[in-house]
Amino acid sequence: VTMPITGPVARNWADTDIITRTQRLGLNVSTTTNTAQIRQTIVYFSRNTSFDLLTGFNMAENATDTAIRFFIGISANIVFTNVEPNTLLNCVGICRLSTSNNLHIVYNDNTGIGTTIDLGSNFPANTISTDKYLLKIKAVSTGIYIKLERVGTAFSYETTLTSDIPSTSTGLNFGAYIVDTSGPNTTTGFDWYGSYIMTNN
């Protein structure tokens, strides 16, 4: 599956802290309203085929800014633009809304505004290269299971989503994006740790 990346930047390894010890790829963008993103050009799994996704990330450049939009997870998108993550259709993932400093779970079916769960101050989205997150999204018989872990802490959140989610036959893929929605041009980014997706076709 082709995976175009917009705004890649190398991150150096160093035995300094939980972030620098992680093999990771930075994605950033220096122009306001433009997106840095990683995406897949086709959809290739669904709830019917079953899927099990594991990925990881941390917020990086300009995370203290108050107008950032961020999403990482599964969706039917093959390209991302400067939109609030809760307007994405057929998605399940983790996001930062431009109105919040916390991470949220976001999910939506093929219509309307998505549902969000504010994970609160124990899951900050406005820290720069300090908080490491692991994300698991999995199709289960009753819906879609999602778990976010803040590595090195006691904080994790997990739930099974049963409504306002993609249908069993909707084609999906993996993707992530970040955008600074307003203000002067400032480099804004996140780090991606790679993804593992297992499907049972």
Model-derived features: positions:
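Solvent-exposed strand-loop boundary residues in beta-sheet-rich modules
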Residues: 76-78, 109-111, 150-154
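Short beta-strand segments enriched in hydrophobic/aromatic residues
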Residues: 57-59, 74, 139, 150, ...
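Ligand-recognition surfaces built from glycine- and aromatic
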Residues: 164-201
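Short, aromatic/His-centered strand-loop micro-motif at the edge of beta-sheets
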Residues: 108-134
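Localized edge beta-strand/strand-to-loop motifs within extracellular or lumenal beta-rich domains
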Residues: 131-145
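Short, solvent-exposed beta-strand-to-loop segments that form ligand-recognition rims
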Residues: 149-172
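Extracellular glycan-recognition surfaces and repeat-rich motifs
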Residues: 1-23
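Secretory/extracellular carbohydrate-interaction modules
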Residues: 25-103
